[in-house]
Amino acid sequence: MGHTDKKRKGGVYLMIGFFIALISGALMSIQGVFNTQVTKASSIWVASAFVQLTALVVCIGAWLFTDRSNPMQVLQVEPKYMLLGGAIGAFITYTVIRSMDMLGPARAVMLIVTAQLIVAYIIELLGWFGVEKQPWEWRKGIGMLVAIVGIVIFKWK
């Protein structure tokens, strides 16, 4: 079922999606702070590897207790570059740790989320990576501009 098919399910489905997204954002902020602290006891790449290893253990545990689908099915994905998500994740972990250490959690997360928003919208506009292409909407452009202005205001002393 595609993204647009799921949207038609109604308000409850969207509300659950909103709730999950809010939890995700909160967990990402907490994880970034935790990872930055772990780095202080070791090194950034050791901390990043530990983070990825613990994520692997949790994912295997969740797989064992839930769906038990064939793990080799993941290799059927096309195009194959989609399998680079884990490698990208390693660099995400690294850049989150570095930015939180250098800027502090609030500034770093604000910039990270704004960058995510802008890149995600560009992906939708251009239909990259198999995402359904969306038309330009002024209100979304203005929303991104407001986010950027928010960064300037937040940083302003």
Regions found by a protein language model. Give the residues of each.
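Structural motif at transmembrane-helix junctions in multi-pass transporters
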Residues: 40-44, 95-114
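Hydrophobic/small/kink-forming positions within alpha-helical transmembrane segments
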Residues: 29, 60, 90, 114-122
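Membrane-interface interhelical linkers
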Residues: 2-23, 40, 56-81, 132-138, ...
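Small-residue-rich packing faces within the transmembrane alpha-helices of Major Facilitator Superfamily
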Residues: 56-57, 118, 148
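C-terminal transmembrane-helix exit sites in multi-pass transporters
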Residues: 118-138
